[in-house]
């Protein structure tokens, strides 16, 4: 990546909104981005998890049984799966999902980009320090 591109994609740019701890929305480019390394995860009109590396974890590994008994609080892999989503460039863990086996990856964040852009243009919202603020 060229220095100019990296500067343009810096997390300090005024068009970036922090959505979660590790996920940003570049509103002008309509792209999901890792806020640790600025890697583009994909179109903000789609599920950001499509651009992530996914790791299926054994729930017994994540939550080992504390009591050696037939019935304990360790999750049963026939009832739950744990899926971790990572940035493919810097390996930052962006999200973790607990899902029933066979359930598709959830599309948990869907932003009305057109309406958001309209409200930014009208001055109803501003972006300050990567935070979206309503203007009174």
PLM feature spans:
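Short metal-coordination and nucleic-acid-contact micro-motifs, chiefly zinc-binding Cys/His arrays
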Residues: 27-30, 80-83, 109
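Internal, hydrophobic beta-strand segments that form the core of beta-sheet-rich folds
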Residues: 88-93, 100
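Short, structured motif recognition centered on aromatic/hydrophobic residues
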Residues: 31-44, 48, 82-85, 94
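Intrinsic disorder/low-complexity detector
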Residues: 1-26, 50-72, 76, 98-136
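Short beta-strand-alpha-helix junction that forms the catalytic/metal-binding core
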Residues: 76, 80-88
């Amino acid at each position: 990546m060229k220095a100019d591109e990296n500067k343009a994609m810096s997390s300090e740019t005024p068009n970036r909104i922090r959505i979660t701890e590790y996920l940003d929305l570049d509103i002008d480019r309509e792209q999901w981005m890792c806020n640790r390394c600025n890697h583009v995860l994909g179109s903000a009109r789609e599920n950001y998890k499509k651009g992530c590396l996914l790791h299926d974890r054994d729930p017994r590994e994540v939550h080992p049984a504390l009591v050696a008994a037939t019935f304990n609080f360790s999750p049963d892999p026939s009832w739950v799966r744990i899926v971790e989503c990572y940035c493919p460039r810097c390996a930052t863990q962006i999200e973790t999902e607990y899902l029933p086996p066979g359930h598709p990856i959830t599309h948990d964040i869907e932003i009305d980009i057109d309406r958001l852009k309209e409200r930014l243009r009208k001055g109803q919202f501003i972006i300050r320090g990567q935070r979206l603020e309503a203007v009174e």
